[in-house]
Design a protein with these regions (language model features):
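Conserved AMP-binding/adenylate-forming
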Residues: 1-92, 98-101, 126
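AMP-binding/adenylate-forming catalytic core of the ANL superfamily
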Residues: 55, 60-61, 83-180
């Protein structure tokens, strides 16, 4: 049975986009389903912005919560809180969550999920989380990646200093990442 990536959220009953077997593209969740329109609001220089969805499948509002409804529904467009972009074929890629964005001192947006995807390429990493670090005054002063490793793979690969190897592998994996 073929398996493909798709994207959906509860407020959109739940389908929004799905890959098709005849046009799979790496790192996308595919094309909008037939009754759905997708637009990217306020895209940055790389095309990433908030994913907005319009269609018959979009909810009418949150039950007994008109304030929350007004925050996310505008002229029939639902603001998902997810960030992504559309490629030149119209396929959707998800890059992160609005509430997870880390804003650097230079004003650039960092999507921790994007960095995590690159780190997950490392064969002995099972899970990773990237987050902003803060100084004693609460000001952001850097990024940190914490990983959970597969100890069996570490042993099979003959790695004796996991921290040292992880640091080297992260720097290698992130060479493909855009410069922020």
């Amino acid at each position: 049975m073929p398996i493909v990536n798709a994207y959906g959220i509860t407020e959109c009953s739940p389908g929004v986009a799905v890959n098709r077997l005849d046009s799979l593209t790496y790192n996308t969740v595919g094309y909008p389903i037939p009754c759905v329109e997708i637009r990217i609001d306020n895209p940055d220089e790389s095309g990433n912005g908030e994913i907005c969805v319009k269609g018959d499948n979009v909810m009418l509002g949150y039950y007994n919560d008109p304030q929350r409804t007004a925050e996310v529904l505008h002229d029939g467009w639902f603001r998902t809180g997810d960030y992504g972009n559309l490629n030149d074929k119209g396929q959707l890629s998800i890059t992160g969550r609005k509430k997870n964005i880390i804003v650097l001192k230079n004003g650039k947006n960092i999507y921790p999920e994007e960095i995590e995807d690159y780190i997950m390429i490392i064969p002995y990493v099972n899970e990773v989380v990237v987050y902003a670090t803060r100084d004693e005054d609460g000001n952001q002063n850097g990024l940190c990646a914490e990983a959970f490793v597969d100890q069996k793979k570490v042993e099979e690969m003959g790695i004796t200093d996991v921290a040292k190897q992880f640091k080297a592998d992260v720097f290698e994996a992130l060479k493909e990442l855009p410069v922020y």
